[in-house]
């Protein structure tokens, strides 16, 4: 027993001599915040603006200035409408669109519309620099209100408006004689699709929806020479009066010493164009 204790004591002393204390590893922590920040990894974000602005290309009008005779076919109605289209010099996007509906004498012959009615009057005033794009559709029958013609006309206007980036808040409809019948029908049916209406020398053939008519400013015109013209003037007076009674904005201008044929052009004086474009 005594020997065993001595052996254990010797082993303990040998182990104690062999063991060497290892110094502890200490991580130094700086108490200086500035020093800590200087040792951090920082990603710099530039706040400088580009020295040169990105150039925006100028708007390029999709059609050259001038006269066009084309045909539109409506996908829904499958009806056709021939039309004369005038693009003025200096045309740009968001221009107004002025539509002129012809009378019986121009049915089926859109080439006549290049020098007739509103187009003729505008060219005498503005030359080739109209302040609007002019559209003169041409029917193949003596009516603007039969069948699907009104719907096809709206389709044509939508097509032109999209292709030429028209200002859809400035779509003006005008017409002479049977074309005036079409004007009354279109504002009665489509209301504020149009921003203004100028019917010349004819009343309506069907009952008008006053709820729609009062949404459109109307400046009607009629001459005072000829039996038929006097009848048309009376018809138009009654319509204008009814629109006013229902709270709408409508007036009738009597063109002194003008017959039915003459009113097709003389109704479109410069102040009338200005009125149309202001509505």
List each language-model region with its residue ranges.
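A domain-start/cap signature at the N-terminus of enzymes
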Residues: 17-97, 174-176, 186, 238-250
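Gly/Ser-rich "nucleophile elbow"/oxyanion-hole loop immediately N-terminal to the catalytic nucleophile
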Residues: 89-93, 141-178
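Primarily recognizes the serine-hydrolase "nucleophile elbow" in alpha/beta-hydrolase
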Residues: 162-163, 169-214
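Active-site machinery of serine-nucleophile hydrolases
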Residues: 97, 101-154
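Sec-dependent N-terminal signal peptides of Gram-positive bacterial secreted proteins and lipoproteins
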Residues: 4-21
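C-terminal catalytic histidine-bearing segment of alpha/beta-hydrolase fold enzymes
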Residues: 219-227, 233-240, 244-279
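Alpha-helical scaffolding within the catalytic cores
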Residues: 113-125, 156, 201-211, 234-238
């Amino acid at each position: 027993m005594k020997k065993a204790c001595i052996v254990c004591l010797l082993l303990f002393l040998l182990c104690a001599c062999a063991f060497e204390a290892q110094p502890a590893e200490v991580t130094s922590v700086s108490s200086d915040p500035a020093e800590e920040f200087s040792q951090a990894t920082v990603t710099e974000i530039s706040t400088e603006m580009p020295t040169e602005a990105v150039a925006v290309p100028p708007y390029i009008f999709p059609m050259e200035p001038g006269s066009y005779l084309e045909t539109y076919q409506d996908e829904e109605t499958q009806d056709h409408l021939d039309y004369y289209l005038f693009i003025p010099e200096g045309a740009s996007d968001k221009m107004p669109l002025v539509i002129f509906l012809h009378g019986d004498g121009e049915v089926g012959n859109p080439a006549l519309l290049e020098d007739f009615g509103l187009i003729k009057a505008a060219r005498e005033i503005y030359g080739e620099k109209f302040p609007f794009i002019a559209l003169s559709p041409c029917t193949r029958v003596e009516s603007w209100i039969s069948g699907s013609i009104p719907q096809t006309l709206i389709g044509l206007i939508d097509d032109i408006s999209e292709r030429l980036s028209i200002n859809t808040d400035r779509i003006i409809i005008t017409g002479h004689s049977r074309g005036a019948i079409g004007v009354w029908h279109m504002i009665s049916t489509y209301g504020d699709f149009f921003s203004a209406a100028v019917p010349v020398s004819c009343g309506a053939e069907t009952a008008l929806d006053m709820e729609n008519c009062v949404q459109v400013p109307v400046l009607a015109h009629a001459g005072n020479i000829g039996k038929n013209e006097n009848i048309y003037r009376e018809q138009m007076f009654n319509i204008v009066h009814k629109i006013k009674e229902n709270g709408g904005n409508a007036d009738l201008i009597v063109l002194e010493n003008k017959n039915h044929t003459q009113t097709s052009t003389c109704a479109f004086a410069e102040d009338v164009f200005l009125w149309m474009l202001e509505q």
